[in-house]
UniProtKB/Swiss-Prot annotation:
UniProt function note: Binds 16S rRNA, required for the assembly of 30S particles and may also be responsible for determining the conformation of the 16S rRNA at the A site.
Protein name: Small ribosomal subunit protein uS14
Gene Ontology CC annotations of this record: cytoplasm; small ribosomal subunit
Family of this protein: Belongs to the universal ribosomal protein uS14 family.
Gene Ontology biological process terms, A to Z: translation
Organism: Opitutus terrae (strain DSM 11246 / JCM 15787 / PB90-1)
Amino acid sequence: MPKTSAIERNKKRIRLAAQHAAKRAELKAILANPATTDDEFFGAQKKLQKLPKNSNKIRIRNRCSLSGRPRAYIGKFGVSRIQFRELALAGKIPGVTKSSW
């Protein structure tokens, strides 16, 4: 089980990313627009740098919803491979069966 602080830090990053998503997208659009003047470009760049580091979507780590494990995350089910195996063998994931040939 990972430290609670790591899980809470990730939750904070998710919250910050959602909170600043619109502003970040607006500034990125200004930077991507080729018709932007130099003053507007550098102004948008400065504002983007002033946003919190953790408000960037890239800094969010996918974690297992049951155990909090950050590695071997299966996105379709939202759990790690270990939890996925336990749930699948217990028959708690509909449509998932153990392969046999």
